[in-house]
From Swiss-Prot:
Its main location: cytoplasm. It catalyses: L-histidine = trans-urocanate + NH4(+). This is Histidine ammonia-lyase. It comes from Clostridium tetani (strain Massachusetts / E88). The gene is hutH. Gene3D superfamilies: Fumarase/aspartase (Central domain), Fumarase/aspartase (N-terminal domain). Its EC number is 4.3.1.3. One of its GO terms (cellular component) is cytoplasm.
Length: 514
């Protein structure tokens, strides 16, 4: 990531890495001078429309089915506040703080392009909230992903008006109290501003963007887990020979093969073709093809994310020439399909990891103790870890069903096909989280299996050696069930993935590709 303390918004060049810095590391945000000028120019056009009582959707008319109802100059402000109050109808659990911060950031970046007609002061209020850590409480459920994320974004706006709820310094309080404590004045919305703040795809985009970032990291962890399992099972290294992969030339496949070879470099655990057996099972032999396909999938989705976080998804838009154009940039379909694709890619990483876990614990498939239990019978060892992993991958298979093929018409059939992109993004996030736990289980089991071969004098590879060290610093070899509560050990392994310690340690020894 860039070594920066502040992210400058231009509306054109926000990166996924910068989004993560703001969302998770608390980096500050500021508008570029170019963005300020663009916002001011676009606002002049809206002021002219209101002053001259021109008919423009969402400025001097009602919304959705009420687009044919004219609104007087005197009621334009009331129209915008009414919009926020009525549209804030989310339900269910609240988004995590990092997602809320990503939502606020991406909405501010879209508005900074200067096509929405918002006042500079209103945009600055949103940025001040982000910088001060006033985080609106936004429900996860209630968006169709078209017209954008209306309900959840309305919840984002409520504290700006002294309404709703927000988290501030770790405490949930009323929106007004949070704004007062942070020293940020409550605002009144002017013409077009309510619509400008909520008509966009930022909730689905922010949720999916963080899932993409986590999936990229997780795929590297997947390669580490696979390499450790290959060593634990004395797998055949010939399957990763670059001569095999260059003749199929998918980037993800070739990168995965190179990663495995880097990780196992110098290993005496691995074998050659014909040494112990002629071929390994698919879950070992086909790691480049399986992991590689997911890498290519996620690279595609990342490309789409970086377009979307620098896009205008408002309606109507205000052009540089002074025209106001109604269109459909709020429609979430361009991201709904990629986020469904992301879920499929992440689910497959968990699928193959669980299959490798089975090969580690099933004594009928290896020469290791049943369920990796040193004293089996009285002790069950890793028996039920596979049950738990199987439950997660089966849940992922349900979650991987695409949301974007579904639609329910809304607003009296004016909005007759919607994207369900926010559901797609939320599902992808959950799939990535489940996959993390499955990989953590495989990593633990692989280290347990390796310890059963410790007396044979084998050496781990250049990269896997570092992974093994990090895991063993946190988690001991499990000899007796009475020594542990398995979920706590799995929690430790999962945290090594979440906090990045595992990947950081390995990448100091070998540079992994994505």
């Amino acid at each position: 990531m860039k070594n920066i303390k502040e992210v400058i918004l231009t509306g054109n060049d926000l990166t996924l890495e910068e989004l993560v810095l703001v969302a998770r590391e608390g980096y500050k945000v500021a508008l570029s001078e170019e963005a300020k000028d663009s916002v001011l120019e676009s606002r002049k056009i809206i002021d002219d429309i209101v002053e001259n009582e021109k008919v423009v959707y969402g400025v001097t008319t009602g919304f959705g089915e009420f687009c044919n109802v004219s609104i007087s100059k005197e009621d334009c402000k009331t129209l915008q506040e009414n919009l926020i109050r009525s549209h804030a109808c989310g339900y269910g659990p609240k988004f995590s703080t990092d997602i809320v911060r990503a939502i606020m950031l991406t909405r501010a970046n879209a508005l900074s392009k200067g096509y929405s007609g918002i006042r500079i002061g209103t945009l600055n209020t949103l940025i001040e909230m982000l910088n001060a850590g006033v985080h609106p409480q936004i429900h996860e459920k209630g968006s169709l992903g078209a017209s954008g994320d209306l309900a959840p974004l309305a919840h984002m706006v409520l504290p700006m008006l002294g309404l709703g709820e927000a988290e501030y310094k770790g405490e949930i309080m009323s929106g007004k109290e949070a704004m007062d404590k942070a020293g940020i004045p409550i605002i009144e919305l002017d013409a077009k501003e309510g619509l400008a703040l909520i008509n966009g795809t930022q909730v689905l985009t922010a949720t999916g963007a963080l899932a993409v970032y986590d999936a990229i990291e997780l795929l590297k962890v997947g390669d580490i887990a696979a390499a450790l399992t290959i060593e634990a099972l004395r797998g055949i290294k010939d399957a990763f020979d670059p001569r095999l992969h260059v003749i199929r030339a998918h980037e993800g496949q070739m990168a995965t093969a190179r990663n495995i070879l880097k990780l196992i470099e110098g290993s005496t655990y691995v074998t050659r073709q014909g040494e112990l057996r002629v071929q390994d099972a698919y879950s070992l032999r086909c790691v480049p093809q399986i992991h590689g396909a997911s890498k290519d999938t996620i690279d595609f989705v990342k490309e789409k994310v970086e377009i979307e976080i620098n896009s205008v998804t408002d309606n109507p838009i205000v052009t540089r020439e002074g025209d106001v154009i109604s269109g459909g940039n709020f429609h979430g379909e361009p991201m709904a399909q990629p986020f469904d694709f992301l879920g499929i890619g992440a689910a497959e990483i968990a699928n193959v990891s669980e299959r490798r876990l089975e090969r580690l614990i099933n004594h009928q498939l290896n020469d290791l103790p049943a369920f990796l239990a040193k004293h089996g019978g009285l002790n069950s060892g890793f028996m039920i870890t596979q049950y738990a992993a199987a439950a997660l991958v089966s849940e992922n298979k349900v979650l991987a069903h695409p949301a974007s093929v579904d639609s329910i018409p809304s607003s009296a059939n004016q909005e007759d096909l919607v994207s369900m992109g926010t559901i797609a993004a939320r599902k992808a996030r959950d799939i990535v989280d489940n996959a993390k736990r499955v990989l953590a289980t495989e990593l633990m089991a692989a280290c347990q299996a390796i310890d059963f071969r410790a007396d044979k004098g084998f050496e781990l590879g250049k990269g896997t050696k570092e992974a093994y060290k990090v895991i063993r610093e946190a988690i001991d070899f499990i000899e007796y069930d009475t020594d542990i509560q398995m979920y706590k050990e799995l929690d430790k392994a999962t945290e090594l993935i979440t906090n990045g310690k595992l990947l950081e340690a390995v990448e100091k020894a070998v540079e992994l590709e994505h």
